[in-house]
């Protein structure tokens, strides 16, 4: 299995398109395995597998920052950042992995612990402002679903991001 060997998104960089598809298939199976035994959010995670593989292939995490809204779609991200055992292993392995993004679990890859909708864009603008103050150039990627995009805080974040004008 590819996903058992992936310790960081950098491990995806040398894979062919066919191999990336296999990684996506294995990630989907791992998400289903965890959710069937442990519970969790199946739909948003399954719907975001290919996008997560693509994001981690294109961007350079952990230098580039991913900010998940609600974290209902973060399981594929966890699989691709060295935490596949929490989706493939025994129940004790699954219990060690949070159902949400968790800096306590992975400070390198999980920037915030969230559980409320519509927050990712605002949080990303905070990272954007910090990046600009430091004078660094990493990408900040806000990941938000259609249900969360209708929240007031998402609109506030979009407004602030446009005011800052330096890109998220």
Spans of model-derived segments:
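Cofactor-/ligand-binding subdomain signature composed of acidic, glycine-rich
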Residues: 1-34
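A short, mixed-charge helix-start or loop-turn motif at secondary-structure junctions
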Residues: 13, 37, 108-109
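Asp/Glu-centered strand-loop micro-motifs enriched in Gly/Pro and often flanked by an aromatic residue
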Residues: 33-42
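Cofactor-binding active-site loop characterized by glycine-rich and histidine/acidic residues
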Residues: 41-164
């Amino acid at each position: 299995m590819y996903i058992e060997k992936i310790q960081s998104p950098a491990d995806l960089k040398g894979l062919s398109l066919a191999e990336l598809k296999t990684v996506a298939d294995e990630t989907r199976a791992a998400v289903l395995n965890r959710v069937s035994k442990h519970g969790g959010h199946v739909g948003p995670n399954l719907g975001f597998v290919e996008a997560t593989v693509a994001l981690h292939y294109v961007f350079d995490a952990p230098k580039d920052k991913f900010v998940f809204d609600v974290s209902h779609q973060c399981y594929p991200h966890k699989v691709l950042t060295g935490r596949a055992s929490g989706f493939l292993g025994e129940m004790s392995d699954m219990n060690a992995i949070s159902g949400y993004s968790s800096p306590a679990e992975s400070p390198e890859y999980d920037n915030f612990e969230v559980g409320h909708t519509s927050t990712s864009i605002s949080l990303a603008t905070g990272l954007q402002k910090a990046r600009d103050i430091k004078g660094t150039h990493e990408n900040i990627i806000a990941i938000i679903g259609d249900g969360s995009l209708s929240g007031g805080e998402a609109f506030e974040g979009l407004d602030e991001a446009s005011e800052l004008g330096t890109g998220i």
